[in-house]
């Protein structure tokens, strides 16, 4: 029996981000819906054709989404919140966009659905909303329409459907509390209807995604899989698909299910292939995810051939990507600025399709010629292990020399706080911002001109200096207590540091979707990380020279730089994080020498880096916290270390937040009405806190009374002497008019509280 290969999904946005541009044009009213639909059809046809030409046996259909595939599933099931429903009950493309964005060219604006991370990736999905007694019906035919499209084009296809249990797991209850799992029997008839429609079209296999099976699920949720799949069996063959981690701990549940195949992720997970092969019913197809869908590295096909060949003939086998290629850039061939050595180490989505074809061909017809092909393909991986671009002996030596004391400040917080009060003499309720100020068209144009050689270094620095000066003048005029330089020189909080550290490379077109039309271009960590020279000191020192008030030095923390980059695969994430920490430790020391007394080390991704299974959290948090402390602990007692985190769940990691031992932590709290601070109160968090007093994601200007009320509420949880006053996050995406007005109101609210306290 032949071993087929398949992908679990393909990037949607297009090589030149065509989907993003078409979406934003439509939203702005500059193009019609038919023009947008035409772009979608063209992209789908191109991507199916590209996969087929690369040698993929079964192309996925249903992986395309206008905004997000979980949102697409909500519409498929007719799950549209009342605030977004059309008067006639129909669902259209603008319904989808209102759910995703809060507004669309037609229909009334209303609050968008909540957005959160898709498992442990940097992709975001729109959270389904569930109400007690909710009804479901087949409401959106996108999947069936796209199957018809692909079949008409002559492709061998495998429709992709998010499974019912994972769909419910990913959602949230709204209104009267109830168990959302109780809705399972209500959504199953819609799934049955969809599968029946696919069977009518001659579909043999359906990829039904249940990634929740890699989690440590409550028993009630595990018990739900058997009745769910009992209801879905019999119409088409079901490939139960898991990814991002192992499934071995849920094997007892899995092997009782009436499905015809199982896909496992052998890259993100560490399941023993032999154990799986023995444990699963012999008639089942076993699909092995061997090509990493989440990274950019060339696969070691020789190694995979050795691992997989013993299974050939033992059962029906497929090979595939570990997960959807959604998380990978599209095509390496258009990267013209990467040097050939580094380029030979990479594979993007199209190249990964070629890897599948090469490996499946070798497994189907092994022999000396095929082995030579695999060895030749894998040769750059072996060469990379010896490359001077990868290994820096000094970094290794420095890492090996780390002691426990290197991660500890000289004195405990209480003693440091006294030294810092004496140094800075700040008022009660000190005011500050998180770091960035509005990135105007002029600022972005300056950076682009400099990057493309249209502006020389001297003129660039002069222009950036003027913008920094403007930011300082604005802050002094507003009456802020601790200032920032505004980050005019930075395009992105991770990319800026990656560009100035050895061990990183950057792509021209390595875009991946983050959510909706937003795409990011992560740096790639290719080798040992070091800092050849100071990165931020020049600008921080200049900004400090313009004012008598303290100016914060601004760094992105090691865990965030790691999480928002494509990491190496030949060393652990812990090693990478600590290499970054050592490089930035030198930056802290240099900032101190330049007279900067307050240094902020942002770690918004600390929680995002958590493993999927809670039993694995402790090991991660130990090294993640240690990396932050290694970065910060070189600071003197009277240097105040700030950190910023912008997520909304602290309760289960409060021990680790406290263990960071930052002198001040600023957090995102305005949208939760300060409720997040209860976790800090219950934990008796000992250090200083700046709860965000207004939401920077909205152009709305908060009133003085609103901010004052939030701060009073904050003071019920945290002693006033340990409270700071600041926005939720950086102001990069805002305009100057609302920024000035919002900050003026914030400063006035703090002044009122000081007067009342006096």
From Swiss-Prot:
Residues that bind L-homocysteine: 434-436, 487, 602
Enzyme nomenclature, EC number: 2.1.1.14
Top EC group: transferase
Keywords for the protein's UniProt record, in alphabetical order: Amino-acid biosynthesis, Metal-binding, Methionine biosynthesis, Methyltransferase, Repeat, Transferase, Zinc
Reactions listed under catalytic activity: 5-methyltetrahydropteroyltri-L-glutamate + L-homocysteine = tetrahydropteroyltri-L-glutamate + L-methionine
Cofactor detail note: Binds 1 zinc ion per subunit.
Pathway in which the depicted protein is active: Amino-acid biosynthesis; L-methionine biosynthesis via de novo pathway; L-methionine from L-homocysteine (MetE route): step 1/1
Binding site for L-methionine: 434-436, 487, 602
UniProt cross-references to Pfam families, sorted A to Z: Meth_synt_1, Meth_synt_2
Active-site positions on this chain: 697 (proton donor)
UniProt-recorded Gene Ontology molecular function terms: 5-methyltetrahydropteroyltriglutamate-homocysteine S-methyltransferase activity; zinc ion binding
GO annotation, biological process: methionine biosynthetic process; methylation
Cited HAMAP family: Meth_synth
Family: Belongs to the vitamin-B12 independent methionine synthase family.
PANTHER family: 5-METHYLTETRAHYDROPTEROYLTRIGLUTAMATE--HOMOCYSTEINE METHYLTRANSFERASE
Role according to the record: Catalyzes the transfer of a methyl group from 5-methyltetrahydrofolate to homocysteine resulting in methionine formation.
Protein's name according to its UniProt entry: 5-methyltetrahydropteroyltriglutamate--homocysteine methyltransferase
Origin species: Serratia proteamaculans (strain 568)
